[in-house]
């Protein structure tokens, strides 16, 4: 591994997860995630290695941090949304769940750029994305019934489309909020399928 030059810094960053996470993400983006160790992150953040691992036990935890908040908010959104149309129910609830990210756009953009940069990094989040997908699948099955492939198919399509939109947003440096971009994109997605259905 290339030698890592310690950067000059002023007041050390505390073990606040947001501050430490942003420090790590900047290093990963600037130097390459494969070239930065967690020890390097601890040095740059001005904290001990043990304190770093209490906050983030791995690189994957840094990059995919925040997914637990999204899945918890998704459960709340789905439970409290009275919409009976499956499409509208999922659209509104998923966009609402991702609104928790709108107050940390710089951090989220760095995370998504890293996720888009490598299939391996993307794969680190498979379990968390699958958890969100299963929550969506259960919500669809509750409305439509469980005895078909549709709940799994629709939930999988929503996750895949959303990740495509979010990584595009990060790489394009679009200045809109995540929810604004996702809301518009999902509306377009719905329109495309509506047009296809009308053409049958």
Question: Which residues fall in each region the model found?
Answer:
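Basic, helix-initiating cap at the start of DNA-binding domains
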Residues: 1-31, 35-47, 64, 69, ...
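A secondary-structure capping/hinge motif
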Residues: 60-62
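Hydrophobic alpha-helical bundle segments that form small-molecule/ligand-binding pockets
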Residues: 103, 129-155
């Amino acid at each position: 591994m290339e030698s890592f030059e310690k950067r000059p810094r002023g007041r050390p960053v505390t073990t606040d997860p947001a501050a430490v996470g942003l420090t790590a993400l900047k290093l990963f983006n600037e130097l390459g995630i494969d070239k930065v160790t967690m020890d390097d992150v601890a040095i740059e953040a001005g904290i001990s290695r043990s304190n770093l691992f209490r906050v983030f036990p791995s690189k994957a935890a840094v990059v995919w941090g925040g997914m637990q908040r999204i899945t918890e908010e998704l459960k709340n959104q789905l439970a409290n949304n009275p919409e009976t149309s499956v499409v509208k129910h999922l659209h509104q609830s998923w966009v609402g769940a991702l609104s928790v990210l709108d107050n940390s756009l710089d951090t989220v953009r760095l995370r998504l750029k890293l996720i888009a940069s490598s299939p391996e990094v993307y794969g680190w989040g498979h379990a968390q994305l699958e958890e969100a997908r299963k929550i969506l699948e259960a919500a669809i099955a509750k409305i439509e019934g469980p005895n078909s492939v549709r709940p799994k198919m629709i939930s999988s399509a929503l996750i895949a489309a959303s990740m495509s939109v979010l990584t595009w947003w990060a790489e394009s440096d679009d200045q809109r909020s995540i929810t604004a971009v996702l809301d518009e994109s999902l509306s377009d997605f719905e329109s495309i399928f509506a047009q296809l259905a009308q053409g049958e």
